Amino acid sequence: MLTVPGLCWLCRMPLALSHWGICSVCARAVRQRVSLCPQCGLPAGHPSLPCGRCLQKPPPWQRLVSVSDYTPPLSLLVHQLKFTRRSEIAAALARLLLQEVLMARRSTGLPLPDRIVSVPLWSRRHWRRGFNQSDLLCQPLAHWLGCAWDSQTITRVRATATQHHLSARLRKRNLKNAFRLELPVQGLHMVIVDDVVTTGSTVAEIAQLLLRNGAATVQVWCLCRTL
């Protein structure tokens, strides 16, 4: 997707603020239009009540906030973020996520985080790519919200296989002991930030690690939640 300074990257109309990248009309258009469970982020009957899945087996986090399903046009921008390290794309996408968070906070009284953490990459993958796309989202979010962020709060201590084609049992085994907590989180309201949440297994493993170490609450914020 071509990004042109001064024009909305999606509709090509002039921007009131050229550094925003996405106009307000397109920002509203990319938002999720189906009713989602506030806890797991999957389609549900009521947007303010946990779905049947979460009532039977709740995830280890209290709230999941996403902008959209992993579909164009947002998925194209997320792909560019992941493989180009363009700071203007990161800031524009972080702003979309911030808008969703603020709307969720107004409607449900969502607590503001004390600290946000990114989903870490395995060191070899981080070295090959040169950056962690989740870090690029965390930086502006922490600045705007006035909360702490440190890319080393959680580290990935071993490589893991791709999750998409694994069963739930194998996903859990694949991620077991893959992460380590490096900073204290006792009593803190924590947020895990990722670009895309697909099965939820990775953020679940990190959420459980935070809760075992005394975090007061855990939320998950992502650009795309695969439906």
Curated annotation (Swiss-Prot):
Protein name listed in UniProt: DNA utilization protein YhgH
Organism this protein belongs to: Salmonella typhi
Functional description taken from the UniProt entry: Could be involved in gluconate metabolism.
Coiled coil regions in record: none
Disulfide bond sites: none
CDD domains (alphabetical): PRTases_typeI
InterPro entries reported in the protein's UniProt record: ComF/GntX_DNA_util-trans, Competence_ComF, PRibTrfase_dom, PRTase-like
Similarity remark: Belongs to the ComF/GntX family.
Record-linked Pfam families: Pribosyltran
Residues annotated as signal peptide: none
